[in-house]
């Protein structure tokens, strides 16, 4: 999961940079989020990320322009800002979930040798 946290952090960093919001949104999404599959994300953010992905890919490109560029070009400044807020909100939620993860112990009885003896329940 920390890979996704890192990707969203990088996207938020781009969004916080200089330049027009539409160009920052394009760069943040294309460089950091485009390769993320919503099925890899926590359940609590799957739908929000899917919605963002839909917004970023909803326009058919023209003249060699990419889908993301075309979609953001058709957005108003307010819509682009809302998408940027969605990225920040997703980053916050993914970070919160990642920080709250507990260590997962192996369930396979063959792997009990890697579990400290005081944690193994005797049968």
Labelled PLM ranges:
Residues 7-17, 37-44, 68-82:
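Non-transmembrane, amphipathic alpha-helical segments
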Residues 19-67:
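Amphipathic alpha-helical interaction modules
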Residues 16-19, 23, 37-40, 91-105:
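Long, hydrophobic, amphipathic alpha-helical segments used as structural scaffolds
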Residues 70-123:
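Amphipathic alpha-helical binding modules
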Residues 1-31, 84-88:
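Short terminal alpha-helical segments
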Residues 6, 31, 39, 51, ...:
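Acidic-enriched, low-complexity/disordered segments with a strong bias for Aspartate over Glutamate
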């Amino acid at each position: 999961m920390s890979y996704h946290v890192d990707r969203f952090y990088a996207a938020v960093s781009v969004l916080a940079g200089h330049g027009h919001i539409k160009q920052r949104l394009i760069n943040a999404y294309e460089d950091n989020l485009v390769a993320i599959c919503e099925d890899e994300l926590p359940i609590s953010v799957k739908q929000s990320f899917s919605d963002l992905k839909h917004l970023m890919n909803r326009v058919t490109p023209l003249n060699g322009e990419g889908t993301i560029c075309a979609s953001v070009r058709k957005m108003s400044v307010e819509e682009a800002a809302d998408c940027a807020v969605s990225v920040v909100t997703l980053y916050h939620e993914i970070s919160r979930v990642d920080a709250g993860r507990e260590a997962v112990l192996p369930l396979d009885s063959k792997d009990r040798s890697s579990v400290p003896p005081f944690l193994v329940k005797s049968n």
